[in-house]
Amino acid sequence: MVADPPKGDPKGYAAAEPTANGVSMLVPIEDVGSLKGGRCGSGDQVRRCLRANLLVLLTVVAVVAGVALGLGVSGAGGAFALGPARLEAFSFPGELLLRLLKMIILPLVVCSLIGGAASLDPSALGRLGAWALLFFLVTTLLASALGVGLALALQPGAAFAAINTSVGAPVEEAPSKEVLDSFLDLVRNIFPSNLVSAAFRSYTTSYKERLFNGTLVKVPTGGEVEGMNILGLVVFAIIFGVALRKLGPEGELLIRFFNSFNDATMVLVSWIMWYAPVGILFLVAGKIVEMENVGLLFASLGKYILCCLLGHAIHGLLTLPLIYFLFARKNPYRFLWGIMTPLATAFGTSSSSATLPLMMKCVEEKNGVARHISRFILPIGATVNMDGAALFQCVAAVFIAQLNHRSLDFVKIITILVTATASSVGAAGIPSGGVLTLAIILEAVNLPVHDISLILAVDWLVDRSCTVLNVEGDAFGAGLLQSYLDRTENCNSVPELIQVKSEMPLAALPVPGEEGNPLLKGCPGPAGDADTCEKESVM
């Protein structure tokens, strides 16, 4: 169905791509380029395209400039020449970006999940959750298998020379935790005992040595450590949203409150996005300057780094786009261009949770994912979908096995795959979370845990690549669910959202010839204008 052109002269109008509900809109020809994801022609259209993609370009340039600036400062003396005080001031703009993003994680995750869960009927909620978890499980298994295959093929640890203390970052003592205790900690964090403390603390098991019958015994002692328990908050928000829906009309006021709170948070996100290029530049540059000898580090661990980055590139540029193309029948690389800003932010911040606000905004405005999809799926994905971490952990496990001349039989390889897929959930979107859970995999296949100290030397780079792949998988999952709902709604024409009563009278429904996006009021175009249109949630 194509909307009617304006009365008068119909020349100079072309049909844009149909929206999710099958409506094509006639727009001026000069605007077609801006509607097709940034494909530009010449003249005014090029300038319009540059303005539309200015933030993306600035963010990508910031990453490149940060690498160049960091290498330049390192070549001029690095951290030793700057001194501690100047180095802290040099990295301060990046630290400020991290603080701004982390500031809005809590209200964004809680409000978006409560509103999303309350707005979906139970059957739709279960169906969406099941499809999302299936997608996350399959892609994580594929990433793990790819990591093991690349490590076995490239043999990154076969010709490795021992690293001395002058290489890379300071070597930290590798963490060690029993597999059972790690699983119990995961379950404990799913059900926090205090929601207030869960906003900034999580539960973990540590060990103390005690003398028992003349023998030193390692006794587990639990306690809380600094770090948001995002897994527990996600579970609580979903359950609370379902409970609000069960209340019926009595819970509608509270649902509207959480939706309004979430909209206000997204306004803050739109402001923070314009500071992101500056913060990313100094985050990347500051981390490179902190490294004592970048050249020696890459020479010693270059094959391991290459194996990890190559695996992330294959999974992110081939595997995930292929899955999206096969099931959604859309161009996956146009989808990737729409989330370029969150991907660059993920590289700079090295945190899936910190990238979540920008990812929500971009998938909704650039890639046409509905609000109730993105704000329900993306927080879950930031918690449980860790494709990059699973791939890196598999490469690291095989790398450490090769270092110690340990052979890996079929059973051990399967154990690595399954354990990496399961333990990646425990990373919970925190920086370097994958390294902390790598000890579980090494314990499962009886590999020495102390060799994790070698992985820590280059984790500053590999962890950033992991984060980019993690958030890309979350976005593709939301896009696939949007495509699935589009097909099922076209077949069944059953609305997924409940109607929330409002004191204000509802506007009349548009006639079929003027049908547009139902999430935007007063905008007849395919996606509306985010600057001039008033958003009205159907939740």
Swiss-Prot record:
Entry binding sites for Na(+) 1: 381, 385, 470, 474
Primary residence: membrane
Sites of N-acetylmethionine modification: 1
Keyword Transmembrane helix: yes
Any one Gene Ontology BP term: protein homotrimerization
InterPro entries found in the cross-reference section: DAACS (IPR050746), Na-dicarboxylate_symporter (IPR001991), Na-dicarboxylate_symporter_CS (IPR018107), Na:dicarbo_symporter_sf (IPR036458)
GO molecular function: antiporter activity; L-aspartate transmembrane transporter activity; L-glutamine transmembrane transporter activity; metal ion binding; neutral L-amino acid transmembrane transporter activity; symporter activity
A Pfam family per the record: SDF
Disulfide feature: none
Source organism, top-level taxon: Eukaryota
Stretches for region Disordered: 518-539
Segments on the Extracellular side according to the record's topology features: 83-95, 155-223, 285-305, 400-412, 447-459
Binding-site positions, Na(+) 2: 383
Subcellular location(s) per record: Cell membrane; Melanosome
Membrane topology: Multi-pass membrane protein
Record's protein name: Neutral amino acid transporter B(0)
Source species of the chain: Bos taurus
